[in-house]
From Swiss-Prot:
CDD domains: BamD
Quaternary state and interactors: Part of the Bam complex.
Superkingdom to which the source organism belongs: Bacteria
Gene3D superfamilies: Tetratricopeptide repeat domain (1.25.40.10)
Name used for this protein in its record: Outer membrane protein assembly factor BamD
Region called Disordered, residue ranges: 289-330
Lipidation (S-diacylglycerol cysteine): C18
Compositional bias (Basic and acidic residues): 289-316
Family in the record: Belongs to the BamD family.
HAMAP family per UniProt: OM_assembly_BamD
Functional summary from the UniProt entry: Part of the outer membrane protein assembly complex, which is involved in assembly and insertion of beta-barrel proteins into the outer membrane.
Keyword annotations from UniProtKB, A to Z: Cell outer membrane, Lipoprotein, Membrane, Palmitate, Signal
Lineage: Bacteria, Pseudomonadati, Pseudomonadota, Gammaproteobacteria, Pseudomonadales
Amino acid sequence: MQVKHLLLIAILALTAACSSNKETVDENLSESQLYQQAQDDLNNKSYNSAVTKLKALESRYPFGRYAEQAQLELIYANYKNMEPEAARAAAERFIRLHPQHPNVDYAYYLKGLSSFDQDRGLLARFLPLDMTKRDPGAARDSFNEFAQLTSRFPNSRYAPDAKARMVYLRNLLAAYEVHVGHYYLKRQAYVAAANRGRYVVENFQETPAVGDGLAIMVEAYRRLGLDDLASTSLETLKLNYPDNASLKDGEFVARESEADTRSWLAKATLGLIEGGEPPPHMETQAAKDVIKQYEDAEREIPAELKPENQDHSADDEKPESDDDEDSGRSWWSYMTFGLFD
């Protein structure tokens, strides 16, 4: 029931936001007055109002003394207002217009930080989500943007934090590849699984996912009858990752059963067309390390960018099981996520 309440609150908040009138800015304000009001809004954490006034300042006084600073602070205001796309667009514009600005490294940093938090939306603050299973597009963008910052401004005050986040993001991307490899194993697409495991080993060295990638290779090669490759991969796994979850008392334990009960259509399409259940949760050391690193990274955000403390009390309440009610739900109940039974 808790999830239903959260969804209802989100819908009502969105409706209220869409129906409310946009804030109007007094046209008689001078440049300095408008800038000072925007600063007051930022200090009061009224980020939506600050965005409106900073945009008005830039449009009314494009060549004023505060124009460049307003563009820079607009990135920050959008980021704090939980509008990552707007923050990234504002950062790209500032970088394009002012590549030699003394604070352009701040624009690069906020651009990467916006992508870093892009997947952590409203529901993600309350619902338990495994970041290693989500679309890695934003993570790749964030990694590349932080890489630009550290390469162009190695002495920037934001470089150390960016490097730490890059380590986390690299581990996240590696763990995602491991999940894809497990998915291929579940679908019995063993060639694809072996290739994915080898990709992890070759491209994500020094990440916790390498051991899991080797385990995928061992299992896939065994299923393909490539015993020599399987033995080589297993010896490497035992030597470098003796505590991997796939090893029990030094012996390799496969995660998937040998039986192939799929239909001919499922086999012909490598499991893409099949009405079976989704792959089960695969607990890996890489996934656990990535989740811990994300939590550590959140605590290391500089003070001026540290998000407000959120109330996570909703996390402690587990939703009641609705399994017994699902069979009698109407199509309208499914369409509204059960809000209107």
